[in-house]
UniProtKB/Swiss-Prot annotation:
Residues 412-490 form the N-acetylmuramoyl-L-alanine amidase domain. Expressed in the fat body and hemocytes. Residues 313-520 are extracellular. Belongs to the N-acetylmuramoyl-L-alanine amidase 2 family. Residues 48-58, 66-78 have a biased composition (Basic and acidic residues). Disulfide bonds join C390-C396. It comes from Drosophila melanogaster. One of its GO terms (biological process) is response to bacterium. Residues 1-291 are cytoplasmic. The lineage of its organism: Eukaryota, Metazoa, Ecdysozoa, Arthropoda, Hexapoda. The gene is PGRP-LC. Keywords: Disulfide bond, Glycoprotein, Immunity, Innate immunity, Membrane, Signal-anchor, Transmembrane, Transmembrane helix. Activated by proteolytic cleavage in response to Gram-negative bacterial infection; cleavage may be mediated by endogenous proteases, such as the metalloprotease Mmp2 or elastase, or by bacterially expressed proteases such as the surface serine protease OmpT. This is Peptidoglycan-recognition protein LC. It is a single-pass type II membrane protein.
Length: 520
């Protein structure tokens, strides 16, 4: 029984047609096929027992089938050939497979059966119940049932491949996917993907032999009423359909991006994900609190380093000034800074022995070498300077400098005449010191055997301050302790040694030492 299948839907002028054989009566064989996710084709085969007939389809790439029937046993043999073609695609894409008429349904071969093609067309015969077989189970509905309209949601393309460099086809309007589509997308339904044979050779499904059978269907049989809609989906293992929240119980689309877009974005640009946006400086933290802490730590560190640099610079500058050479000319002495404790008084109130060294009161260097003193000495001489009194260190420094200038320039001495000077502020100003011979008596016999304690001021009628008397005791004890003064020393007045010298007159000063142990 030769017949011809329509290969393309667009080439079938009438998918449902009537075939009448005047010799054998209303015997027909109608076939329907399911597409492998690509195109639906309806095929019709006309049964003629004596001569071969050919379907009037005009489509390109028709499939031809041949069958033979023995009239003695009324056996029908149907052969159907399926051509599978592989389109040329890139190496990186999957092959696109187009399958035409993969199954054949034989509706009726009985002589008394109703012509199904007449039922499908505009005939006057009554149609029997519709049989719908879907995914392994069969459900029967009466004609014009409302369930048939609900089932006809159109064909769904479940496999789509786009070659690299090929323009993407815009998706159709979003529609509610059927139950089968959801199962396929969620991975609950396994879909067999047909593979193309090697070498492009055609394959057949074999031969079918029927004997004394009525209303036999091979494969799926589908009835479509209304327009056919093709939907495109991408199949993977992820759950594409998730139940939505709320009373409606709708479906959420996980690919939807509901974030606000930034004004001025380029057309077609995607919303930037803050978690995926690389930071400008990866080594820096992202939170505001950490940034504040980082800035604070950096600021404190820089401030600390700056303080160290300033302290080091100031210390070096101070040492340079202190180690500068003091010259004897007046122009240089005017520019010598006072960077010591020159403005500080004796905070001990005379109870602490405090020396003001030559460098601190800005003494001139000696004009020549001064002879050494034979130590320990047994004589300590007290005498006045016959200058104005002083009660602060600043004034006392001025008095000492003036005395040195007078002794060097007027008296033609090599240095200030006294070993030590005691001021009203309670400080001891170092003159020639412990080891050098003084010029206080202008007599070599006394000067070479004694130390001189000069009291700044005139004490003919004014007594020395309590600070001056207190530091005098401390100075004598320090000399004995250092081995500069003999333990059995004699403490006396210059006027007693040279009564004729009027400059040594200081009765109020000498009277202050009248009850001292070593005074004589």
């Amino acid at each position: 029984m030769p017949f011809s299948n329509e290969t393309e839907m667009s080439q079938c002028s009438n998918a449902k047609r009537r075939v009448n054989d005047p010799l054998t009566g209303p015997k027909n064989c109608s076939t329907s096929s399911t597409d492998s996710g690509v195109i639906l084709n309806d095929n019709v085969a006309a049964f003629r027992p004596e001569k071969e007939t050919k379907d009037r389809g005009t489509g390109e790439g028709q499939f031809q089938s041949k069958s033979e029937e023995k009239t003695e046993s009324k056996r029908i043999s149907v052969e159907h050939t399926v051509n599978i073609t592989t389109e040329n695609v890139g190496k990186t894409s999957s092959p696109a497979v187009s399958i035409r008429s993969t199954t054949i349904s034989v509706v009726s071969i009985d002589d008394n059966a109703i012509d199904s093609s007449s039922i499908d067309s505009d005939s006057e015969a009554e149609a029997e119940d519709y049989t719908v077989q879907k995914l392994g189970h069969q459900v029967t509905y009466p004609p014009n049932s409302s369930h048939l309209r609900d089932l006809n949601q159109g064909l769904t393309v479940i496999s789509r491949h786009v070659a690299p460099g090929e323009a993407a086809v815009p998706p159709p309007n979003p529609l509610e996917a059927g139950i089968v589509a959801k199962q396929i997308l969620n991975g609950n339904l396994a879909v067999a993907t047909p593979t193309s044979p090697a070498g492009g050779a055609t394959q057949g499904i074999g031969s079918i032999a029927l004997t004394n059978s009525t209303d036999v269907t091979f494969g799926d049989k589908h009835f479509y009423e209304g327009p056919v809609t093709i939907q495109q989906f991408l199949i993977d293992n992820r759950d594409k359909w998730k139940p939505g929240e709320g009373p409606a119980g709708g479906q959420d689309n996980p690919a939807f991006n509901g974030g606000p877009s930034t004004n001025g974005s380029a057309p077609g640009s995607k919303h930037e994900d803050p978690a995926q946006t690389p930071p400008i400086c990866p080594f820096l933290p992202n939170t505001v609190g950490r940034k504040a802490v980082t800035v604070t730590v950096v600021f404190v560190t820089l401030t600390f380093l700056l303080g160290i640099v300033l302290a080091t610079t100031t210390n070096l500058f101070g040492k340079t000034l202190n180690q500068s050479k003091i010259r004897d000319d007046d122009d240089y002495r005017q520019n010598i800074p006072i960077n010591s404790t020159i403005d500080l008084d004796n905070i001990g109130g005379g109870l602490i022995l405090r020396f003001v060294e030559r460098q601190q009161w800005l003494a001139q260097p000696p004009q020549k070498e001064i002879p050494d003193l034979e130590l320990p000495v047994g004589l300590v001489i007290a005498l006045p300077t016959n200058s104005e009194n002083c009660s602060t260190q600043a004034i006392c420094v001025l008095r000492v400098r003036l005395l040195q200038t007078y002794d060097i320039e007027s008296s033609q001495k090599c240095d200030i005449a006294y070993n030590f000077l005691i001021g009203g502020d309670g400080n001891v100003y170092v003159g020639r010191g412990w080891n050098k011979m003084g010029a206080h008596m202008n007599n070599i016999n006394y000067d070479s055997q004694s130390l001189s304690f000069a009291y700044i001021g005139s004490f003919k009628t004014i007594q020395p301050s309590a600070k001056q008397l207190s530091v005098t005791r401390l100075l004598l004890e320090r000399g004995v302790k250092l081995g500069k003064i003999a333990p059995s020393y004699r403490f006396t007045a210059s006027s007693k040694l040279m009564p004729s010298v009027t400059d040594f007159k200081a009765d109020a000063l000498y009277a202050s030492f009248a009850n001292w142990t070593h005074w004589s």
